[in-house]
Amino acid sequence: MSGSGDRRGGGPPGSHSGWETMGKKSKKPGQAGGRQWAPWSSTNVTPNTARPAWGGSGSSHPSGTSWAQAPDHGAATRGNPRPPSQTSRPVLAPPLANGWQWQSRPRPSGSEVKKDDAPPSGSVPEVENVDGNNTSDDDDDDDDDLSDDISDDYDSDASEKSFETRKTNKWFKEFFEVLNTLSLEQINEQTRQWHCPACKNGPGAIDWYKGLQPLVSHARTKGSTRVKLHRELAALLEEELSRRGTSVLPAGEQFGKWKGLQESTDREIVWPPMVIVMNTFLEKDEDDKWKGMGNQELLDYFGEYEASKARHAYGPSGHRGMSVLIFESSAVGYMEAERLHKHFVNQGTDRNSWHLRKVRFVPGGKRQLYGFLANKEDMEAFNKHCHGKSRLKYEMRSYNEMVVIQMKQMSEDNQQLNYLKNKMVKTEQRSKAVEESLGVVTQKLRETIEENIFVRSKAKEKHMEYEEEMKSQEEIFHGLIEDIHKATEDKEKQFEKLLQEERSKARRFDVDSGTMKDRQLRKEYVQKFIDCQVKDVAEFEVERDELIKVHEDKKLKLKKEYMDLELELEKEFDAALTGLMEKHKPDTFEASSS
């Protein structure tokens, strides 16, 4: 950017009268030839404004500090149209009182953000892009600024430049100078707030990032303006933190830093579980040797705790006053031993009491027993004068393995047992319900079968009655038909007899008396009568046959219709019976699954 008026030297702007102008030749006609920062006006800030640096908490806020509001005629933002008269020149907020000290600026409250966003009085506010016509031009300028800035400080091949040289870029120099003054603890503070140096004098310059992780994420993902500059910032930050022996914390680790429990709570315990009982002396015998409790006597004293065995320690002087209660080799046995141990603790007769302020006798002359869970040193002391098979055998085992895991397994088994018990109860309830339902259904089935037998017998009786009635009606019907047939036969016989009589009369007629003519006439008349009768008989036979045929056809047709009607009647009966059976069909029995 030779020939431009940009600020050099890398230092932050001081408290002098104003910023130096940085300009760049425009690559596009019609655009402004450079960018300017508005002069610093001391009248815009309340005189006694204090801007203390945060100590990582971000809680310090300016008191009574605000930017003066811009004049109404300059408010081209929030949807107002762009002034058509001149090319808009973005004017940024005045510099900080102490220079570009990002970490030293207090984060404004919600009400102060709105005030700080406004430009100072007397300056022209930056006009938003309403119609979207100049966005690409601004982006091109930003990319050009980045290219020029990098090429001004060092050669274009960034991969060959040293890390320290890249940090002296004018965009990052002040940021890394501040970063170098902080310790690792201060850098990793999640409450420390930062501005993005790559967004300086542009959109997002006033945004705060709580911790370096959000800042690095912003630099990695920035995709609209100054993309190369943001990527360079992300790479430099990661390299800087790596060289200083730290890294950017993941987002999930930014909050909630607490010290938890120890990694392991396991310990070694004596197995099988044992409780040492001290002061079990009784008295000395004639040989000046101590006598003490017996095994059963010791078990009886602590019968509430279900110890399985008892042993006593003996030495050259007899009973050593040290006894042990051995419990079952299980998690339950350990819990019993621990319960006895806690009983001694609550009573004030535990290990500490025995070692620090042992009181062997209580008022009345009785010996006070002390007890505690056995450890390895106790067992070695117990076996001090024991050799070979007389030594009390034990081993040191993992508490988690022998107690915790077994208790968890017992809990799971108990839950499984409860589940199986509940399941068994439900199964028994279901079985009982099914049995009751089966009894009810069986009773109903039995009653239904009896009802069906009764209905069938009644139906059979009715059927027999109907058959007898139909048979009787059929006999009457056949009798009437037989009577008709008999009457018809009688009529036919009478008719034939009449024909024969008339023919006989004609044949017996005297045709020989009288004249020849008369005889001839009488013969012709008789012959004609006989011929006519024969002819009539022949016609009668023909017509009778036709009548019989017609009658038989009618009978056949009537029988067919009757059979069809009977068949239809049987079908109707079958359909009605099927519907009745469907109506009274018993429900399907299914065992309840609930």
Swiss-Prot record:
Tissue specificity remark: Expressed in a dome of cells at the tip of the meristem that extends into the adaxial side of the initiating primordium. During the later stages of leaf development, expression becomes restricted to the margin and vasculature.
Is Coiled coil set as a keyword in this record?
A: yes
The processes (GO biological process) annotated in the record are:
defense response to virus; regulatory ncRNA-mediated gene silencing
- Stretches of Acidic residues bias are at 136-157
Extract the ranges annotated as region (Disordered).
1-163
Note the Gene3D superfamilies from the entry: XS domain
Origin: domain of life: Eukaryota
UniProt feature coiled coil, ranges: 408-509, 545-577
Keywords, comma-separated and alphabetical = Coiled coil, Developmental protein, RNA-mediated gene silencing
Q: Please list the residue ranges that the record marks as compositionally biased, kind Polar residues.
A: 39-49
* Record CDD domains: RRM_like_XS
Q: What does this protein do?
A: Required for the biogenesis of miRNAs and trans-acting siRNAs and essential for the specification of adaxial/abaxial organ polarity. May be involved in natural virus resistance.
Q: Which PANTHER family match?
A: PROTEIN SUPPRESSOR OF GENE SILENCING 3
Q: Which family does it belong to?
A: Belongs to the SGS3 family.
Q: What is this protein called?
A: Protein SUPPRESSOR OF GENE SILENCING 3 homolog
Provenance organism = Zea mays (Maize)
Q: Which gene encodes it?
A: SGS3
